[in-house]
Amino acid sequence: MPETPRLLFVHAHPDDESLSNGATIAHYAARGAQVHVVTCTLGEEGEVIGDRWAQLAVDHADQLGGYRIGELTAALQRLGVDAPIYLGGAGRWRDSGMAGTEQRSRRRFVDADDREAVGALVAIIRELRPHVVVTYDPDGGYGHPDHVQAHVVTTAAVAAAGSVGDCDYPGDPWVVPKFYWTVLGVSAFLAGRQALTPDDLLPEWVLPPEDIPFIYPDERIDAVVTGDSDARAAKIAALAAHATQVTVGPSGRACALSNNMALPILADEHYLLVAGRAGARDERGWEIDLLAGLGFTGFGT
């Protein structure tokens, strides 16, 4: 019986998986791959949209993190993933908030003991033995401290998981064949932004600038996963499940966070290959399957 491909996505907060990789996760899950998502915090510091759940926020009941477990569970189910995995267990590390956020009583993810956090992820990698691991670039995408920390922890864990000589971590060594950063490609972003019309937006939303600092030029891209209509629909449904954090527009072509900046909901999701050997590339120089070169068939776009 042929081996089932396994992919692991590591994210900082609930909703990051749907915003960054929702179409990719749905694409591979629908084709029978084993897909898992590790989330590093409960997202306690998130800014709540609307009045219904506003009292859950950190400055009131401080119950948002627990509520977001349900949102993440629902979102993952819509993407085809059974259940969330929390690094160190649910609630081990608190959402650190943006730079300058007041420190709370429980240990923030950015203050996690490096060996403990890395060890927790090494244990997951060695248990699940993923063929592909995905996390943020060194800047954490848009720079959130927890995204940067997730990059640091994941990079160290991928290296340590395959080390035969490191016996301090549980499990048998596993060398991850391909390690990617999730990034936002400039052409896809600008095309998506340009295509938005007033019918796609709520009245209070504004379009983002064309030169947002964390988009990547096409020549730096190594891979793209293009979700079909089903994968895109799953991504939209997953984003809608994160209702305390994300509002999906009336047409399903855009969404916004609490800052009311409209973001196109893209079916194309882009990646940089930072470890492992690339598979076949298209005329743009891009892989169109994160599993390319690993001997799996039927999982490309």
Swiss-Prot record:
Binds 1 zinc ion per subunit. InterPro entries: GlcNAc_PI_deacetylase-related, LmbE-like_dom_sf, Mycothiol_biosynthesis_MshB. Gene3D superfamilies: LmbE-like. Its cofactor is Zn(2+). It catalyses: 1D-myo-inositol 2-acetamido-2-deoxy-alpha-D-glucopyranoside + H2O = 1D-myo-inositol 2-amino-2-deoxy-alpha-D-glucopyranoside + acetate. One of its GO terms (biological process) is mycothiol biosynthetic process. Keywords: Hydrolase, Metal-binding, Zinc. Zn(2+) binds at residues 13, 16, 147. GO terms for molecular function: N-acetylglucosaminylinositol deacetylase activity; zinc ion binding. It holds the Pfam family PIG-L. Its EC number is 3.5.1.103. The keyword Zinc applies. It is an enzyme of class 3 (hydrolase). Catalyzes the deacetylation of 1D-myo-inositol 2-acetamido-2-deoxy-alpha-D-glucopyranoside (GlcNAc-Ins) in the mycothiol biosynthesis pathway. Belongs to the MshB deacetylase family. This is 1D-myo-inositol 2-acetamido-2-deoxy-alpha-D-glucopyranoside deacetylase. It comes from Mycobacterium ulcerans (strain Agy99).
